[in-house]
Structure formats: structure tokens, C-alpha cells
Amino acid sequence: MEKDLMITELLNAWEETYKKGQLTFWVFLALKEENKCVEEIKEFVETMSEGFMSCEEQSLYRNLRKFQHLGIVAYDSKRVSKGPDRKYYYLTDIGKALFQRFVERNILIFTKESIINLLTK
């Protein structure tokens, strides 16, 4: 039982570190096909990750501001029926190219048959 507890604790720590590094990936994936407001990005991340990833709206706003400053994300403002205009974020051409290269270098490697075989043994 002690061994299982240790594995669970180590796994939780590993996943927390892993999740922190994945937020950018999930935000870019959310914006890959269409413009989204922060609430839609949050919902996309939680739904597509099957609940594995969750993020606070404040974290998303902070990251989106950083990405905007770097020129990889921009936004259009749209009027909504109530309240202030809503910002709909999208990847710029540089952001799209950056995301594509990241996927090619870091994600598609996991689709290689040799890697799949190791993961599923």
C-alpha cells in the first residue's frame, strides 16, 4: 500500500509540472481553427483534454497578454448584447507558424510506430 501511495504522490507531482508546461499548447490549439473569447478557450481546453487540463480565466488573460506582446496572438473586439465589447483572440501568421513547428518537433513524434509500440507495451 505504501508503494501505491508513493507512486500516486510522484505521479501527481509530475502531472502538475507537466500541466504547467502544457497551457500554451492548449491555448494555441484552441485558437488554431477559429477566434475564441477567453470563456470559449477555457471550455475548449477542459473539454478537449477530457478534464485533465483546467485553467483559470486570469491565467488565460495573463498568457494572452504575453502572447499579444510577442506578436503571436491578436484579437478583434465584438459587441455583445450586454456589457463591454468581448475580445476574440486568434493566432497571427507568426503564431500559426510557431505552433506548426512546435507540433512537428514535439507532438508528431508520438505518432511514430516505434514510439506507439513502446507506449502501449
Model-derived features: positions:
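Intrinsically disordered, low-complexity serine/threonine- and proline-rich regulatory segments
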Residues: 1-22, 101-105, 111
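Hydrophobic residues on short alpha-helical segments
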Residues: 24-29
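Short capping segments at the starts of secondary-structure elements
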Residues: 30-40
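DNA-recognition alpha helix
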Residues: 39-51
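Short, hydrophobic-biased segments on the C-terminal half of alpha helices
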Residues: 57, 61-65
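Beta-hairpin "wing" of winged helix-turn-helix
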Residues: 68-84
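Basic, amphipathic "hinge/linker" alpha-helix immediately C-terminal to the N-terminal HTH DNA-binding motif
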Residues: 81, 85-102
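Amphipathic alpha-helical dimerization/coiled-coil segments
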Residues: 96-121
